[in-house]
Structures are given as structure tokens and as C-alpha cells.
């Protein structure tokens, strides 16, 4: 990524839900290429209604570069922490720093919050390495997922 000044991360609007759903599907389907058992994703990843509900609840975010939607996130904010439900980037923009930019934007949303939590599938080598690179520490795991936490 050459220039962060052309990037915008903000709450999604209703008109963006269809595009964000499309990008979510495309992004999560690439997980199949890095260890996923099938073309699949987290609950609701391929459901426009689910994304619409997340948007109405204020949890769906849009990531734009040069005013083009290239990714998004679903996050849940409380007074002390942020749970990162998922991030996704258009596969055409993978490995260009935009995932890092989204994570940095999330971590900068509210400077009073210093605790960030997320989980990712055990089998997804790419996302586990990505979150560790960003300073997230494994807190627990089960048969499906690894749970991570970061304190700023």
C-alpha cells in the first residue's frame, strides 16, 4: 500500500451492504486455498440479510481506497474492548497491506479502548500468522478456533 491518506474506514451505509456481502464471500472463499476444508466462512459471511442486520446495528464497517470499496469488517465495541468479528479484503487487493490498514483503523477507532479480541480458524495458516504479526497473543483454543487478544 503506497499511501494511507487515500484510505477511509467508517461505518457502512445501507447502500454498501450488497457490495460488502459480495466481497465477504470472495475473501472467505480464498481461505480454501490456504487450508480450509471447503468454500465456506463464518456464520453469515454469504448472507446479505445478515450483513444488513450488522449494518443496522452499527457493527458493519466499510474500507475504501480512492473511494472504492475494497473491504470491510464486523466489530463489536463496548466501553472497555473491541471484539473483531471479522475483517475481509477483496482478493484482488490481498497482500498489499490493506488488511493491516483495516486492523490499524479498528485499533484507532477509540483511543480509550486498549483491549482487542478476535478468533480465527485453527486450520487457517494465513490468518493465524497475520494476527500474530500484528502483536495478537493466543489466549486459548478449542478444536475449531484460536482466540487472540491484544493490549495497546
Q: What do the PLM-derived regions correspond to, one by one?
A:
Residues 93, 97-105:
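Conserved acetyl-CoA pyrophosphate-binding loop and the N-cap/start of the following alpha-helix
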Amino acid at each position: 500500500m503506497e499511501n494511507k491518506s487515500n484510505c477511509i474506514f467508517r461505518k457502512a451505509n445501507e447502500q454498501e451492504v450488497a457490495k460488502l456481502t459480495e466481497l465477504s464471500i470472495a475473501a472467505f472463499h480464498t481461505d480454501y486455498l490456504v487450508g480450509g476444508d471447503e468454500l465456506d466462512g463464518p456464520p453469515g459471511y454469504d448472507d446479505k440479510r445478515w450483513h444488513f442486520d450488522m449494518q443496522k446495528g452499527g457493527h458493519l464497517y466499510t474500507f475504501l481506497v480512492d473511494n472504492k470499496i475494497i473491504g470491510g469488517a464486523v466489530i463489536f465495541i463496548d466501553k472497555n474492548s473491541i471484539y473483531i468479528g471479522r475483517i475481509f479484503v477483496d482478493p484482488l487487493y490481498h497482500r498489499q497491506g490493506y488488511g493491516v490498514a483495516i486492523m490499524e483503523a479498528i485499533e484507532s477507532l477509540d483511543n480509550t479502548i486498549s483491549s482487542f479480541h478476535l478468533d480465527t480458524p485453527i486450520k487457517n495458516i494465513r490468518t493465524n500468522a497475520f494476527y500474530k504479526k500484528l502483536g495478537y497473543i493466543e489466549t486459548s483454543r478449542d478444536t475449531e478456533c484460536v482466540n487472540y487478544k491484544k493490549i495497546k
